[in-house]
Amino acid sequence: MPACRPGPLAGALLLGLLLLGLPRVPGGEVEKTGVCPQLQADLNCTQECVSDAQCADNLKCCQAGCATICHLPNEKEGSCPQVNTDFPQLGLCQDQCQVDSHCPGLLKCCYNGCGKVSCVTPIF
């Protein structure tokens, strides 16, 4: 008995069914890491980008009022913990960062108890 072989039409149909079952990402783009900072409203309402993929390097497509612009993410998710001023902070009292992107991993650049900023674990 001859073996049953699917024809080219059956192969194309199978491929189409497989592709229909895959989850779709809008525009096929992946969101870049980081979080957009709060930006001043752009009065021109310029639409520089629609997604992160349209921005160079590690810039993100961020909302600025009615505009969207490519901007360097400098804020990470979470919020800074409240500083307890009742107790003096031990350790070096100097600035360790200026923006979140200066801190490794998930750490955020936040004010510490001695009036400077350092990389700390955020609150989620």
Swiss-Prot record:
CDD domains: WAP. It comes from the Eukaryota. One of its GO terms (biological process) is antibacterial humoral response. Gene3D superfamilies: Elafin-like. Residues 29-73, 74-123 form the WAP domain. Glycans are attached at residue 44. SUPFAM superfamilies: Elafin-like. The keyword Disulfide bond applies. Disulfide bonds join 36-62, 45-66, 49-61, 55-70, 80-110, 93-114, 97-109, 103-119. Keywords: Aspartic protease inhibitor, Disulfide bond, Glycoprotein, Protease inhibitor, Repeat, Secreted, Serine protease inhibitor, Signal, Thiol protease inhibitor. It is found in: Secreted. Epididymis. Highest levels are found in the caput and proximal cauda regions. Lower levels in the distal cauda. Not detected in the efferent ducts. GO terms for cellular component: extracellular space. Its main location: secreted. Residues 1-27 form the signal peptide. GO terms for molecular function: aspartic-type endopeptidase inhibitor activity; cysteine-type endopeptidase inhibitor activity; serine-type endopeptidase inhibitor activity. Homotrimer; disulfide-linked. PANTHER family: WAP FOUR-DISULFIDE CORE DOMAIN PROTEIN 2, WHEY ACDIC PROTEIN WAP. Broad range protease inhibitor. Possible function in sperm maturation. This is WAP four-disulfide core domain protein 2. It comes from Canis lupus familiaris (Dog).
